[in-house]
Swiss-Prot record:
It comes from Brucella abortus (strain 2308). The gene is aroB. Keywords: Amino-acid biosynthesis, Aromatic amino acid biosynthesis, Cobalt, Cytoplasm, Lyase, Metal-binding, NAD, Nucleotide-binding, Zinc. This is 3-dehydroquinate synthase. Coiled coil: none annotated. NAD(+) binds at residues 115-119, 139-140, 152, 161.
């Protein structure tokens, strides 16, 4: 069991993958400790710090100072903020910057940012010189509890989200809870959707705890650290069992089949929809669709929607600004989902709170009819 170990100033959650195991450190002040922690694990490295313009303005100087104190030379590579940086063009830009800096295979790529920066940086680290070291320093709640853990990396294409990438586990994850204080309320809410997801997958006790304590999670302190640690613990356990998503790791995609389709439909325009908002709507739809298919009671869907609404997250197609294309177009995006096998649809559905399961061969006609109904309500 990947039980978190508590220290005076941080929590450590191990990810057990044999000789590729690594630690997730969670706590305050980890930006300042980053140089020390990296130096313990990666001797004599130089690093490329990949970050976006917004994060760089707030955290880059402190991180570079931390590396300098540890005797680690760092080269910043700054990209534009937002989902559109998960592109072939930005991939080429970052790759070229690392090669121009003459970083070697034994050096490290450090991702300082949210899920976009982490996904992009991990892909770069996996392909430059056929594989460099990789350190995740997630600065959003979403990245701290989800995308920084487990080794999924990649970019988007015109055909859909995350369709080009590699599995590339980091050597270390440093989740500084203090940096979350700089997030906008919208960004924090979006990350919270992934926290709630872990309770909805297979931990009804955790979901009930979130229903009772979400305000404390938002305000910070011990409840926030607990929510992050428990989320990481849940994901680490799944990744240890199924690193390459050949089995139950697919459960972590609860809400993502619908959510990714909505992100694609909005052109990855973060002014309209960010990933966590898509996941929130996607989870609500997954519970509604499960009820429609007589797999779960409507009470579970209503409870999920009530909690997500309480924290300020969207739960319906009507809440996507700018409207959506017809159901047939949404189905085209769903058909590009990575869980599609030989043309058949796979969804993560549910029998109730904390009772999610992998549903194979879901009838496309049923999904299409469901989407038409939900769009009509919108």
């Amino acid at each position: 069991m990947n039980a978190p170990t508590t220290f005076a100033d941080s929590v450590t959650v191990p990810v057990s993958l044999g000789d590729r195991s690594y630690d997730i450190l969670i706590g305050k002040g980890l930006v300042e400790r980053a140089g020390e922690e990296v130096a313990k694990r990666l001797k004599g490295v130089r690093v490329a710090i990949v970050t976006d313009e917004n994060v760089a303005a707030v955290h880059l100087e402190r991180l570079q100072a931390s590396f300098a104190r540890a005797g680690i030379d760092s080269t910043p590579v700054i990209v534009a903020p937002g989902e559109k940086s998960k592109s072939f063009a930005t991939l080429e830009t970052v790759t070229n910057a690392i090669l121009v800096a003459k970083l070697e295979r034994g050096d490290a790529v450090v991702a300082l940012g949210g899920g976009v920066v982490g996904d992009l940086s991990g892909f770069v680290a996996g392909i430059v010189r056929r594989g460099m070291n990789f350190v995740q320093m997630p600065t959003s709640l979403l990245a701290q509890v989800d995308s920084s853990v487990g080794g999924k990396t990649g970019i988007n294409t015109a055909h859909g989200k995350n369709l080009v990438g590699v599995f590339n586990q980091p050597q270390l994850v440093l989740a500084d809870t203090q940096v979350l204080d700089t997030l906008s309320p919208r960004e924090f809410r979006a990350g919270y959707a992934e926290v709630a997801k872990y309770g909805l997958i297979d931990r009804p006790d955790f979901f009930a705890w979130l229903e009772a304590n979400w305000q404390e999670v938002f305000s910070g302190g011990a409840a926030r650290t607990k929510a992050i640690a428990e989320s990481c613990r849940s994901k680490a356990a799944v990744v240890a069992r199924d690193e390459r998503e050949t089995g139950d790791r697919a459960l972590l995609n609860l809400g993502h089949t619908f959510g990714h389709a909505l992100e694609s439909a909005t052109g990855y325009d973060s002014s309209r929809l960010v990933h966590g908002e898509g996941v929130a709507i996607g989870m609500a739809l997954a519970y509604r669709f499960s009820a429609r298919m007589n797999l779960a009671g409507i009470e579970a869907a209503e409870r999920v929607e009530a909690h997500l609404k309480a924290v300020g997250l969207p739960v319906s197609l009507a809440e996507v600004p700018g409207g959506l294309p017809p159901a047939e177009k949404l189905m085209d995006y769903i058909a590009q989902d990575k869980k599609v096998t030989r043309g058949t649809l796979t969804f993560i559905l549910t029998h109730g709170i904390g009772q999610s399961f992998i549903a194979k061969d879901v009838p496309p006609a049923a999904v299409l009819e469901f989407l038409k109904e939900r769009l009509a309500i919108a």
